Amino acid sequence: MSAAPTTAPVAAVSKKGKKSGDTINSKLALTMKSGKYVLGYKSTLKTLRSGKAKLILIAANAPPLRKSELEYYAMLSRCSVHHYSGNNIDLGTACGKLFRVGVLAVIDAGDSDILAA
């Protein structure tokens, strides 16, 4: 009687979260090339107050008080909010910048369909 090791088939790891991150990154890169946007907390607040922002992206490690303030202004200006899954370094890299980006506001998406996300 041979005691061959039996292993249960390993389920493939789902990369659903990674895939959605990739799509938002590619849409964001297209927005950076063809659309209008502002980077940073103060500039985003100004665009939210003026009602020009269509979408705001907030990095995962943004301070909670800033997050809630941005969400409040977005609610007042009827702007959608996307909580980016990565930190501010990842968001800066996704924007094609060599610096950290905590918050960005999309004013005009250009050729990208990021507003549908």
From Swiss-Prot:
Keyword Signal on entry: no
GO MF: RNA binding; structural constituent of ribosome
Annotated spans, Disordered: 1-22
GO cellular component, one term: cytosolic large ribosomal subunit
Keyword vocabulary terms for this entry: Cytoplasm, Ribonucleoprotein, Ribosomal protein
Function as written in the Swiss-Prot or TrEMBL entry: Component of the ribosome, a large ribonucleoprotein complex responsible for the synthesis of proteins in the cell. The small ribosomal subunit (SSU) binds messenger RNAs (mRNAs) and translates the encoded message by selecting cognate aminoacyl-transfer RNA (tRNA) molecules. The large subunit (LSU) contains the ribosomal catalytic site termed the peptidyl transferase center (PTC), which catalyzes the formation of peptide bonds, thereby polymerizing the amino acids delivered by tRNAs into a polypeptide chain.
Subunit composition and interactions: Component of the large ribosomal subunit (LSU). Mature yeast ribosomes consist of a small (40S) and a large (60S) subunit. The 40S small subunit contains 1 molecule of ribosomal RNA (18S rRNA) and at least 33 different proteins. The large 60S subunit contains 3 rRNA molecules (25S, 5.8S and 5S rRNA) and at least 46 different proteins.
UniProt miscellaneous comment: There are 2 genes for eL30 in S.pombe.
Name by which UniProt lists this protein: Large ribosomal subunit protein eL30B
Source organism of this protein record: Schizosaccharomyces pombe (strain 972 / ATCC 24843)
